[in-house]
From Swiss-Prot:
Superkingdom as given in the UniProt entry: Eukaryota
Subcellular compartments: Nucleus
SMART domains given in the database record: CRM1_C, IBN_N
Family: Belongs to the exportin family.
GO cellular component annotations of the record: cytoplasm; cytosol; nuclear envelope; nuclear periphery; nuclear pore; nucleus
Protein purpose: Receptor for the leucine-rich nuclear export signal (NES).
Effect ascribed to mutating E430K: In crm1-809; cold-sensitive and LMB hypersensitive
Identification of the protein by name: Exportin-1
Recorded name of the encoding gene: xpo1
Subunit (UniProt): Interacts with php4.
Amino acid sequence: MEGILAFDRELDVALLDRVVQTFYQGVGAEQQQAQQVLTQFQAHPDAWSQAYSILEKSEYPQTKYIALSVLDKLITTRWKMLPKEQRLGIRNYIVAVMIKNSSDETVLQQQKTFLNKLDLTLVQILKQEWPHNWPNFIPEIVQASKTNLSLCENNMIVLRLLSEEIFDYSAEQMTQLKTKNLKNQMCGEFAEIFQLCSQILERAQKPSLIKATLGTLLRFLNWIPLGYIFETNIVELITNRFLNVPDFRNVTIECLTEIASLTSQPQYNDKFVTMFNLVMTSVNSMLPLQTDFREAYEESSTNEQDFIQNLALFLCAFFSSHLRPLENPENQEVLLNAHSYLLNISRINEREIFKICLEYWSKLVAQLYEEMQQIPMSEMNPLLNLSSPTSLISSNPNMLANLPLRKHIYKDILSTLRLVMIENMVKPEEVLIVENDEGEIVREFVKETDTITLYKSMREVLVYLTHLDVVDTEIVMTEKLARIVVGTEWSWQNLNTLCWAIGSISGAMNEEMEKRFLVNVIKDLLGLCEMKRGKDNKAVVASNIMYVVGQYPRFLKAHWKFLKTVVNKLFEFMHEYHEGVQDMACDTFIKIAQKCRRHFVAQQLGETEPFINEIIRNLAKTTEDLTPQQTHTFYEACGYMISAQPQKHLQERLIFDLMALPNQAWENIVAQAAQNAQVLGDPQTVKILANVLKTNVAACTSIGSGFYPQIAKNYVDMLGLYKAVSGLISEVVAAQGNIATKTPHVRGLRTIKKEILKLVDAYISRAEDLELVGNTLIPALFEAVLLDYLQNVPDARDAEVLNLITTIVNQLSELLTDKIPLVLDAVFGCTLEMISKDFSEYPEHRAAFFQLLRAINLNCFPALLNIPAPQFKLVINSIVWSFKHVSRDIQETGLNILLELINNMASMGPDVSNAFFQTYYISLLQDILYVLTDSDHKSGFKLQSLILARLFYLVESNQITVPLYDPSQFPQEMNNQLFLRQYIMNLLVTAFPHLQPIQIQEFVQTVLALNQDSIKFKLALRDFLIQLKEFGGDNAELYLEEKEQELAAQQKAQLEKAMTVPGMIKPVDMPTMEEEEL
């Protein structure tokens, strides 16, 4: 096999064929050897020179593909280094092979795959050579296409690929200037290409040529001037000639969809309407509106199903861009006809098609709602010259009946859409009970992200539909519920989708209407729960009751009796053993507790005491059938209620009563342990202790700063237990070795330690009196925890220690500065030793370690200046190691630490900052340039760019006043600016010998000049990186910042818009009102 690696003699192509065949068809060691040899062959810098021989002589297709991939690599990375004659020779050879394999129809079909790869290689050459070194390419390919039908077919594919490379994929593969030049060239020479396409589509009879030309036209349509579309006959031509032909209709309607997506000046409106009428006439003849689309889709071929999906895409694209001209009276018939088609398509049981339709429905109802909002109240009722409150309009649709609103055009369409949305409603994430593939009702354990996203979109549409006609929405929902209750439409699916839809419109009705509607719904559901027999039926109804009530906190807050009834019903469900019911009852309870907390601690009219008193009194009975995790949720829910009690002495009493049971268990075990330490050897005791601590964590999480009396009560015993447990673990490890840390007993003991740490963390992160924390909690905590962490074997160290210290540093900030050396002595060196051996061991410690470093740098920076120089050097080394890490999160943390450290140092006095930069500037610069040009670290581009710009600025602005070089090694006129230029030049020339020195020199001058303009600096940096052969592959991550900014801006705009629409943000997701925080 190694014979193919002998580049000093002619390649044995037959041997290469056998090696490739072994790789693809062999097994075991022989296959691995073939893989190794082929990898070496492809990596060899002279491998491309064998491509001609391989393409001419090889008998095995995969071998030819390898030859083309080697050529592709040459073209994309070293093309400019080749002499002009060699470049011309390769280009002419590729063209010749392409013509040879595409001029004959039989050969074209046989060599289709090879030819496709050959076309891609030609396009890579075009990106390098055209137009400057190949100015006649477009005229040549157009002329050649007229000589031979099969050659013409392949040329269409080449033109399509070239268009895709320039207009679709260029952003992340070529520099900005190169992309702009190629786009201008393509547009400038398009007339010839368009004329060729038109001639083919008018005259050709060969199906594969027609399909290839339509496919190529499809790629042109999103960038060519509109004159080519509407000032020629191309639309009529493709619609009349190809839309009704099964073989061509999919690619034809894709072309029409691309045209429909274009936005234009009003002068083309009539052209768009004419096109739409043409298409809908064909659609009505091919697929009559009366067809049962759901059934027809199920029975259709793949080609026919694709057409229905493409029709949905066409309708949605056209409506999204050109709806208003269709709303003119003369076009309303075709408008409503087309919307009826879209409604029928929306009923098809295919999620991807429904999502296409949903995107348009969402736009339509949002537009109609916004128009409605802009009508002044004075136009609806001159007596009320006020701005229009949404709830008044929503609850009085008749007020709008006489106004010229667009929503009136769509009245029947919107009424049907309400039913379609209800029938298709997907499961909200709060619902834990689902029907599995076997038709059984079970608890769902894995949430589907796609379903959650789809639910949010459907919910938005239903909220808008409610505002557009609240009366019709109520009628549609109550009539459907009535049919379910009487049994004519009873099914789990029908009840689920209806209740999910009812829950989704919470907040969209005014309070009076919501009350009437919801009272009827909940009464019907409670009656259904009593009426239905069978555990599965009851579980389905129960889950829907819980979901609906959980979505309407405003209603519950306004109707105390109903709230109390609902909560007592939840307590009943907590004794129901059907899978998922108890979980959902607890989740709904905590949701209601968060949103209605004040109502539980206030004494309501007609009650003898606040409801929280009764809940705590019956706590043991209510939670007796719950799992420990569910019980913790219950305690957390009670904590939210207690946090709303404004009177401190009453709040403390409630906390005392709430924690009575866990405190009793705690005190019993602590008393026993004081008498006999062996108690902690009992697994059941360990389990009880862990559970008690987790209960405390749950309550502390929701009660917050007010939990101090409970913390203080058990704090000394807790730290004593921490030490005792740690001693037991050490004894077991000493006796049994490291393996002991994996045993159930030691794992149980470690859980106790972790929960103690989590409890302290939970309290300190919410504490308000930080001096009290610093003076009373921290000294004893550090005494118990730090030395223990240092002395433990690595496998017995808990990452929670690092998390807790990070919380303390973030909370106490400069109050903790004097204790940072103590902290670093205990946790820094030993943790660094654990995580620096590789990139994978101790992942939790790894993440926590760097988060701690960042917290210290941000909050207690002066402490870092006072640690010994060797330890400080270790800190710097660990930061560098973190941003060279393979984990994205750790890379990002490391880069943030470095940027913040550089800024901190630059803000210090010259003595401190100069000393730091003189020691570390050059090594840090080298490390940043390393990760910047390394393909495994592309995700850090944004922060790498900011750090580099900051480092350059410090030199260019003379903020560093000491030499960054050894003055004895350089002439007297040397300065930092000149040294930096030379240093970066030498570094890059050495690292990337394939780049011309002039390229590197221009890059260095540009980025140094742009160090204060972060956007231009980043663009220049990105263009340079794309040129690097080592930086090949997918460069999408270099654009991550723009994508993140765009997404953040979209999310912000969506949130601001949603806040203006009642019900658009779920009441349970709304920020808690001030009154609830009392």
